[in-house]
Amino acid sequence: MEFPGSSDNYLTITGPGHPFLTGTETFHTPSLGDEEFEIPPISLDSDPSLAVSDVVGHFDDLADSSGVQDEGFAAQYGVQTLDMPVEMAHEVMDQTGGLLGAGLAMDLDHPIVTPYSANPPVTIDVSMTDMSSGILGHGQLTTIDQSELSSQLGLSLGGGTILHPVQSPDDHLSPTPSPTSSLHDEDMEDFRRITAPKSIIVEQTKKPKTPKKKKKKDPNEPQKPLSAYALFFRDTQAAIKGQNPNATFGEVSKIVASMWDSLGEEQKQVYKRKTEAAKKEYLKALALYKANQLSQVAVDTVDLDPPAVPALLSESPVPSPTVVTATSIPECVSSPSVSSSPSQTVAAPQQSIAKIIISKQILPAGQGSTAIAMSQGMVTVIPATVVTSRGLPLAQLQPSPQAQRITRSVLQAAMQMPPRLQPPPLQQMQQPPRLLQMAPAQQPSITILQAPPPLQPMQKVRLSLQPPPLQIKIIPPPLQPQPQVVQVQNQSLSVINVPASPEAPASPPEQLEVLPEVVQEESPPPQMDVELVSSSPPPSLSPQCVRSGCENPPVECKDWDNEYCSNECVVKHCRDTFMSWIATRSQGTLAPVK
């Protein structure tokens, strides 16, 4: 196949050696402007009755003498049977005559180059260059119909089937326009529709990015302390700004950096000590803040309606039962009194409770049934802050006229008892059922004057199994760090079978005294050795003014962090620091800037 360059676009079929077809006799391929041609394949039968001269007679009116002569094939050969499906697709011409796209596909069942024999193949030359100069110049545009061509050639199409090229429904083009008339309007519309550039718009659905929400900084969170250099910078920048009001922040930073490098080691130690003290205070405040956050999270995540765990409680003659006092319950428990019966089922909601174990020997001997009930029972004490935050109706809870006060020895005995002597969390569930027996007339209440020790994981699990129903009255604590006064009116006391430890110190019964009235508030005895953790930081040891030579205590001022006694000391300190820096600068001992 050859594509010789010429000024005309033609399709030349030269049968070598045939006198009726020369190189000057050509027939033009129809040019219809911007359109797409799809020529179906034509199967030629080697019928001896085929007269090729009919083809020449049919195309005499289309002959053009401007064709390129091809004299490369001069021998006489016959026509060989060929199956040549030829497809020309997307011949798109613009107004300037430039070829935008052209394609030629030929499928030959027999190769063109074959060994020479009596019947060599016919050579087909297709020239597709410079299509505008030769074809677009004609005023009369004609098309060749496939059926017309087959009728003129007298081809028998039964043996050789015409393979139509596969066309999409959108790009369908009728292959049989009129051979002697110009294009109709609908054909032009089809051509425009086919040759029009198709743009496929693919909408990409992108998920909108959700902006990340920045965590709001808790105003109660303690602020990080400043470094020694930051403290020095804060103290000296005011003096530098006073002398150089037009100085930029970068210039001030360079000056302060050089001043800090030239500062004496003793003066640097002053700032470093302040930073260390501030860091210690920050760590303490941060620990308290995190503890409060954890306690709030624990309160918020408590299951309000947990499944009930039935348990049969009974009084067993053990040598030393215990009274358990809790310090931290996520929410208040207020349930009706449990009637005294040989067997009673108590629903136990899951709660996080700490406990204090008190041996039986510390209870007074005179309070026989009360002592047994209290020793066999579990008394739960709820802090005032938790109950008041949950909205406990205090008016509905009335205390009993009889109250027992747990004094220092009771708390010390409970705190000194080692945790390893406590039964594991699942021990209660493995014990046999027991009956609850208690006197319904006696409803003692316990007033605790001191905060019990912190929680332990084993204590939380243990008391979450079988807490007793209680009615509780809480007196909110004052703002100052004072012991919480919690009054508990016991409705029903659960039995806990815990053997007493021989290592636990037993206090004499005289340590307990019965009060005729409920203790509202009372300061702890001076000999109490119980540490209270309060939110207020410990007082610093004799703070003094930062300015050297001034021994006055600092005055509270938010601008200077309570470090100076007056504004005069602030100015003097900054001036002294600045003057010392100027003196070192004049001596030529200026240190490099950071």
Curated annotation (Swiss-Prot):
One of its GO terms (molecular function) is chromatin DNA binding. GO terms for biological process: positive regulation of transcription elongation by RNA polymerase II; regulation of transcription by RNA polymerase II; RNA polymerase II promoter clearance. The keyword DNA-binding applies. It comes from the Eukaryota. It is found in: Nucleus; Chromosome. Component of the PNUTS-PP1 phosphatase complex. Transcription factor that modulates cell fate reprogramming from the somatic state to the pluripotent and neuronal fate. Also acts as a regulatory component of protein phosphatase 1 (PP1) complexes. Component of the PNUTS-PP1 protein phosphatase complex, a PP1 complex that regulates RNA polymerase II transcription pause-release. PNUTS-PP1 also plays a role in the control of chromatin structure and cell cycle progression during the transition from mitosis into interphase. This is TOX high mobility group box family member 4-B.
